[in-house]
Amino acid sequence: MKAYSRSKLCNILFTRELARRLHGTGITANCLHPGFVATRFGDQSGGLISPLVWLAKFFAISPAKGAETIVYLASSPDVAETTGQYFYKSVPTMPSSRAQDDRSALLLWQRSAALAGMKE
């Protein structure tokens, strides 16, 4: 789970930096938490976590419900000029303090570009 959590943090940081770089272009970049969606994620976990994954699915939302914020961000005129934000249930929400660190966002961007063999 630690790797999964870090990947989600990186998604938020990368989006913040992308939004900063696109500022003034008319292109927006936002990220979101879809909620706990009933998917097959974790089905192959095995060990002690398998019963927890199975049990948790009773509290999950449908994929259609989980997609609502994605559709909202892609189509609503209410957020047409909103950028660099983190949304949950179609509402801008403050992510963790680590996810608001602009220096970390820049460093992640630079490291990603270097790993991809791209210039800044």
Language-model regions, residue ranges each:
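C-terminal helical subdomain
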Residues: S7, C31, W54-M94, Q100-L106, ...
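Short glycine/threonine-rich loop-to-helix capping motif typified by GTGT followed
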Residues: D43, R98-A99
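Generic C-terminal helix-cap and adjacent flexible tail
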Residues: A114-E120
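A generic structural signal for secondary-structure junctions
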Residues: G46-G47, D78, G117
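Catalytic loop of short-chain dehydrogenase/reductase
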Residues: M1-I27, H33-A56
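Non-transmembrane alpha-helical segments in soluble domains
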Residues: T15-A19, V71, W109, A113
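Generic hydrophobic alpha-helical segments
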Residues: L18-R21, A80, V91, K119
